Amino acid sequence: MANGQVPSWQTDGPQIEEDEFLIELPIELLAGKIYLNIEMGGQPRQFVLDTGSPSMISASLAAELGLQTVGKSQGVDAHGVTIESNIVQAELGLGGIRLRNVPMFVADFSSSAAAQCLLGDGILGSEVLPLCVWQIDLPDSTLRCASRKSQLDHLRGSSQQKLHSYGYPHTPYLDTQLAKQAKSKAMFDTGSAPLFVISPPDLAGTQRVGGIAGYVYGEGSSGTSLGGKSPNRRQQKAAIKRLAIGNLKLGKVEAVQRDLAPSLVGSSILEEHVVTLDSAAGKIYFDRYRKRSPQRSSFGFALSFDGGTQVSLVWDNSPAAQAGLEVGQKVLALNDIPADSSCPSIRDALTSLQGDSLKIEWAGGTAELKRP
């Protein structure tokens, strides 16, 4: 490829064959991730809808379908680890429409039990956003893709905000107000569960103008991505006094700090709003269906699943910390269900963490945790 030349796999697609369409696809939410079925090779495949990522396909499925490498790309994962990937182009079936020449990063999920379980066959990512008007409707468990905005409900009376995109892979960004004198942009990332995850520059700017009400600290890893588990270190959450997306006020929000910019608006916002993205027009719509409520408290710990189920993060003074949980402890059972690295066990564990109480057994103790 000549220096500065845009690779053909970025310009050839993706494309939709049909001119006029409205499709509705059933979706399922688990641990903040949105699952849907996509047809590839004549079979339904389970994908994750992740607006904060380019589209990906598991190496095993790419091999099964005989997809040819059309390029390579280098990027960083959520924790800053450099990842080099082969690129393939694929045809996808979504309801009654066909997507052609979709560029997909080939990823080996098999090296991580959690990735293999939770990412399934791949990711439907941000480069498909300009192809139609997308609507994520959790109350109806439906993802819609419409050729025209006028085909959709949930727009009249909704909060219309600006949606920014800066070329391939068409990652969506939103205007955010973190304090009276602190404005920024955040990625709309449905692959991230928390309502808001704050970047170091945004945190510093918000703190400087008095927009932070306080901090909560913890110890452990900020999570696992394709480049592996991030190292254990001191972690912090910041209570933002008043957060807004454009003029959509979200009020006081507790935000975990991430390692990199930008900040993220995550899938938790879908638990209160039907969200419609019109990338071509640069607009996003939030139709509130549930009254804004205080953020739900947590048990105060997180799990990792590679090499067995282990405690990966504990927040200070939380129910988990008070019960004696420590980073690195092996978890034996959750709600009396044995914990291991199998996919059913991982899904059971993540479901258990959504309850109001949790019985946990680990190597060294047992406790009944309740949300504060």
Language model segments and positions:
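Pepsin/retropepsin-fold aspartyl endopeptidases
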Residues: M1-P372
